């Protein structure tokens, strides 16, 4: 893997780690409202870029795939944003980044061979997740559902990467990014309407944060991961944000003085060790 790819992955990791901090900072803006404007702004920025540098049309085979990828990406952000508001940043980011576990399972279900080392890694990771999920602090109230939503968001991002790995084989990254972000925005809009919310529940001063979310964690973060998925396996790409719980929790510790739950500290090593084992035995490129 070239140094350029390593640099892109590093920038993507730092960028996506800023999401949880912004969600906590703008507490008065509903989670789904934040998620919607994040995706819409990211899509608009990429569409504006396309005016200067026109892109090719999406092939017929990939149009349906982009719809599915965008749907799962929208659900990922909707679930993750709500999860961060309902549990600690440490637990939410930890559970949301279980994507490598799900991509490995999905790869196996699609007929790809999965080694015994990968299976062992999955079991270790699941054990750690159980510690985080069913500990005393998270077994009741909002923390419980925050953890559930965050875990489901991990499955959704895994599905997104599975579709992206096929789409990016013959689709430019800008073209894929602007399309999948737009479909994700529409998905979040529908979820917001069905849940009785509004995408206009914000103040003018919040707009700068929508722009920030669209540029930094979306374009510099997820869109850079989309770029790399052409050269790496879905499991390898899904593993990159695993450093997010540490970085995001550190941000929140210094900015908001948020205490990291003991259960998250205990469960995290199991999750990380299991995922590292999974990733090291899942890379195909």
Can you say where each PLM-predicted feature lies in the sequence?
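Hydrophobic transmembrane alpha-helices of multi-pass small-molecule transport proteins
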Residues: 46, 50, 67, 73, ...
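Juxtamembrane helix-entry segments on the extracytoplasmic side of multipass membrane proteins
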Residues: 2-5, 27-36, 58-63, 134-156, ...
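Specific transmembrane alpha-helical segments of multi-pass solute transporters/efflux pumps
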Residues: 51-90, 96, 131, 214-232
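Helix-helix packing/entry segments at the starts of transmembrane helices
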Residues: 37, 92-98, 164-185, 218-254
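Glycine-/small-residue-enriched transmembrane alpha-helix faces in small-molecule transporters
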Residues: 1-36, 68-71, 75, 79, ...
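Hydrophobic/small/kink-forming positions within alpha-helical transmembrane segments
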Residues: 17, 47, 70, 74-78, ...
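Transmembrane alpha-helical segments that form core, pore/gating elements
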Residues: 13, 43-46, 103-105, 109, ...
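Juxtamembrane C-cap of transmembrane helices in multi-pass membrane transport proteins
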Residues: 15-29, 41, 78-87, 95, ...
């Amino acid at each position: 893997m070239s140094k350029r790819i390593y640099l892109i992955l590093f920038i993507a990791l730092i960028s996506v780690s800023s999401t949880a901090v912004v969600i906590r900072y703008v507490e008065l803006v509903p989670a789904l409202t934040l998620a919607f404007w994040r995706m819409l702004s990211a899509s608009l920025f990429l569409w504006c870029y396309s005016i200067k540098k026109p892109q090719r049309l999406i092939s017929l085979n990939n149009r349906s795939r982009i719809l599915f990828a965008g749907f799962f990406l929208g659900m990922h952000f909707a679930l993750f944003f709500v999860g961060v508001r309902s549990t600690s940043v440490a637990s939410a980011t930890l559970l949301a980044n279980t994507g490598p576990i799900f991509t490995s399972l999905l790869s196996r279900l699609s007929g790809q061979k999965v080694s015994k080392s990968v299976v062992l890694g999955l079991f270790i990771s699941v054990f750690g997740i159980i510690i985080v999920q069913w500990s005393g602090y998270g077994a009741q109230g909002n923390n419980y559902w925050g953890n559930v939503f965050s875990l489901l968001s991990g499955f959704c991002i895994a599905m997104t990467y599975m579709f992206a790995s096929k789409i990016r084989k013959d689709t430019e990254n800008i073209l894929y990014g602007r399309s999948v972000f737009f479909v994700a925005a529409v998905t979040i809009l529908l979820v917001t309407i069905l849940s009785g919310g509004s995408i206009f529940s914000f103040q003018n001063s919040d707009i700068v944060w929508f722009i920030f979310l669209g540029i930094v964690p979306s374009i510099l973060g997820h869109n850079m991961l989309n770029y790399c998925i052409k050269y790496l396996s879905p499991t390898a790409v899904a593993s990159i944000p695993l450093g997010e719980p540490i970085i995001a929790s550190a941000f929140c510790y210094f900015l908001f003085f948020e205490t990291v739950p003991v259960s998250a500290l205990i469960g995290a090593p199991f999750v990380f060790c299991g995922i590292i084992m999974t990733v090291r035995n899942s890379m195909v490129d």
